[in-house]
């Protein structure tokens, strides 16, 4: 079961990487909504994107990704793995989401954004690092606690539905 959960977590992480790659395929400005306000303002001032485009990209990202991630983990845990009850669902959800969180923090934030040129928006290089040490601490804390809360809420809802 643990190997299965590891693979499902890696699958969710791969989905996140794919979504990021698609978002920056025409340049990192496509995901500027993930950057700090100063980077967004600079991109707008340079005519690379408008405030409205940033808003639309952010909404599209949230509308597609969040339901997609939730559907993925629910299908894995309840349809494929057959979890029933709160505790079996909770720990499986937590493992899968935690693996994705580690991939997001280490592979995407630390390596891809922090050490490659793929996420550089022209004219904003002086605003690097795009993800500061303080951001990283917040993301680790929120990611760790957030995944536990999300897992608990989803497991609770599914325990009620499947009861």
Named regions from a protein language model:
Residues 24-66:
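Cytosolic-side membrane-entry/anchor segment at the start of a transmembrane helix
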Residues 105-125:
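Juxtamembrane non-transmembrane "cap" segments at the membrane-aqueous interface
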Residues 40-57, 121-139:
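Short membrane-interface loop/juxtamembrane segments of multi-pass integral membrane proteins
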Residues 6-31, 96-112:
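Hydrophobic alpha-helical membrane-embedded segments
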Residues 8, 82-99:
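Interfacial segments of alpha-helical transmembrane regions
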Residues 79, 97-105, 109, 133-150:
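C-terminal halves and exits of single transmembrane alpha-helices
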Residues 154-163:
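Juxtamembrane boundary at the C-terminal end of a transmembrane helix
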Residues 59-78, 139-154:
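Core segments of transmembrane alpha-helices
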């Amino acid at each position: 079961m643990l190997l299965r959960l590891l693979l499902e977590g890696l699958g969710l992480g791969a989905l996140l990487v794919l979504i990021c790659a698609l978002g920056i395929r025409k340049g990192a400005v496509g995901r500027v909504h993930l950057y700090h306000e100063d980077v967004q303002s600079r991109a707008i001032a340079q005519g690379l994107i408008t405030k409205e485009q940033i808003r639309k990209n952010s909404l599209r990202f949230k509308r597609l990704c969040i339901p997609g991630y939730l559907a993925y983990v629910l299908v894995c845990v309840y349809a494929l793995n057959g979890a029933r009850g709160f505790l079996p669902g909770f720990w499986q959800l937590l493992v899968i989401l935690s693996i994705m969180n580690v991939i997001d923090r280490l592979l995407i934030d630390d390596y891809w954004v922090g050490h490659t040129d793929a996420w550089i928006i022209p004219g904003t290089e002086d605003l690097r690092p795009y993800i500061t040490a303080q951001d990283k601490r917040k993301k680790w804390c929120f990611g760790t606690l957030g995944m536990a809360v999300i897992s608990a809420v989803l497991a609770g809802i599914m325990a009620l539905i499947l009861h």
